[in-house]
């Protein structure tokens, strides 16, 4: 009997081709589009993104073309609790969260996996650019063939159980190859642009979104320098992130950057670019893939944000919940709330949340 797999279909080219590839490999494929948007009226005008209403229609059309069943499932409550509420709270605390990482851990590879198993499926699959591998009885992830599209950074916190029940067929292809496959099999989404914005914030203005959702909780405060001198007024700490230069609304005659955010006093500290370069960080909520615990210092390549290049570093254990990361070269804007992720020979070692 063929193994059954539920493919999370966003209506984009990657998940559409993932469904096709798995069907070609002999799996019994079921397409599921996750309904996560919170306010139907607010999203009616969205033209793209995995939360848009048009994405549902695109996914349905692809499923029909591939001759596979397709369902739309409601994940609103879980998405609000684990992604949106977390996103807002982190910004209110002066941090810079990554909602895609939270969505992967709690929605796509947890809630969707549970629904998939309720349908009798053996696996859940996505269009992520990564490859699941089993090395020495442990599941881990290998970087995608297309390093420009590699998405392993956002998948470091998956559990062994989740990885054991996950398929990512796009990881062995380059993006242009995925688009070519879509063209060859007649999928209308072959030229659909990639979604780059935060899916639940269509205009990408996270500050305005948080202010609208939290109503009167976002307050104006002071910009200060390192000595505590007041430099001017800011719109609210949720509008700013470490290393930010644009959108400060002030002119000092020299390049000025956000070098710290103080949520308890509602202050944003400004300084020079030199002030945001550091070599050390501490990470919490750490998850390792090839092994359970770090038992001795380890040389790795580490990324402090999705778009950054991997940099040489040494990781060592501080206690049961935290690790220290020491980079060989100084890194720009190591930001609380973002994830630091580790690699060795293109294998994902693990990662954690930057705490200090």
Curated annotation (Swiss-Prot):
Catalyzed chemical reaction(s): S-sulfanyl-L-cysteinyl-[protein] + uridine(34) in tRNA + AH2 + ATP = 2-thiouridine(34) in tRNA + L-cysteinyl-[protein] + A + AMP + diphosphate + H(+)
Record-level GO BP terms: tRNA wobble position uridine thiolation
EC number assigned by the record: 2.8.1.13
A GO term for molecular function: ATP binding
Site (Interaction with tRNA) residue list: 128, 338
One Pfam family from the record: tRNA_Me_trans_C
Region (Interaction with tRNA): 149-151, 305-306
Main location: cytoplasm
Matching Gene3D superfamilies: Adenine nucleotide alpha hydrolases-like domains, HUPs, Translation factors
Domain of life from the UniProt record: Bacteria
Gene Ontology CC entries for this record: cytoplasm
Cell location: Cytoplasm
Annotated function: Catalyzes the 2-thiolation of uridine at the wobble position (U34) of tRNA, leading to the formation of s(2)U34.
Membership in a protein family: Belongs to the MnmA/TRMU family.
Name of the molecule in the record: tRNA-specific 2-thiouridylase MnmA
Species for this entry: Clostridium kluyveri (strain ATCC 8527 / DSM 555 / NBRC 12016 / NCIMB 10680 / K1)
UniProt lineage: Bacteria, Bacillati, Bacillota, Clostridia, Eubacteriales
């Amino acid at each position: 009997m063929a193994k059954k797999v539920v493919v999370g279909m966003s209506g984009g080219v990657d998940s559409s081709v993932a469904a096709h590839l798995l069907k070609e490999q002999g799996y019994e494929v079921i397409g599921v589009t996750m309904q996560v948007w919170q306010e139907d009226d607010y999203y009616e005008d969205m033209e793209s993104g995995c939360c848009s209403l048009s994405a549902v229609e695109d996914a349905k059309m692809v499923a029909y073309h591939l001759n596979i069943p397709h369902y739309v499932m409601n994940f609103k409550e879980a998405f609000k609790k684990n992604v949106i509420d977390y996103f807002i709270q982190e910004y209110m605390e002066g941090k810079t969260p990554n909602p895609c990482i939270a969505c992967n851990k709690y929605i796509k590879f947890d809630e969707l996996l549970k629904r998939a198993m309720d349908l009798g499926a053996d696996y859940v699959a996505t269009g992520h650019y990564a490859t699941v591998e089993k090395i020495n009885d442990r599941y881990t992830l290998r970087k995608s063939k297309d390093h420009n599209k590699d998405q392993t950074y956002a998948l470091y916190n998956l559990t062994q159980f989740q990885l054991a029940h996950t398929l990512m067929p796009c990881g062995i292809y380059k993006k242009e190859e995925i688009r070519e496959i879509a063209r060859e099999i007649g999928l209308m989404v072959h030229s659909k642009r990639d979604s780059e914005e935060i899916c639940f914030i269509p205009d990408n203005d996270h500050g305005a979104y948080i202010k609208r959702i939290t109503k009167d909780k976002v307050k104006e405060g002071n910009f200060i320098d390192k000595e505590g001198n007041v430099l001017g007024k800011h719109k609210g700490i949720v509008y700013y992130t470490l290393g930010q230069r644009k959108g400060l609304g002030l002119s000092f005659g020299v390049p000025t950057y956000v070098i710290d955010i103080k949520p308890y006093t509602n202050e944003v500290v400004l300084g020079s670019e030199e002030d945001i370069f550091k070599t050390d960080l501490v990470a919490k909520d750490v998850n390792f893939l090839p092994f359970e615990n770090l038992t001795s210092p380890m040389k790795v390549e580490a990324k402090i944000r999705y778009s950054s290049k991997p940099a040489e570093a040494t990781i060592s254990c501080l206690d049961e919940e935290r690790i220290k990361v020491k980079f060989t070269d100084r890194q720009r804007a190591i930001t609380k709330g973002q994830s630091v992720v580790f690699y060795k020979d293109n294998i994902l070692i693990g990662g954690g949340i930057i705490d200090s």
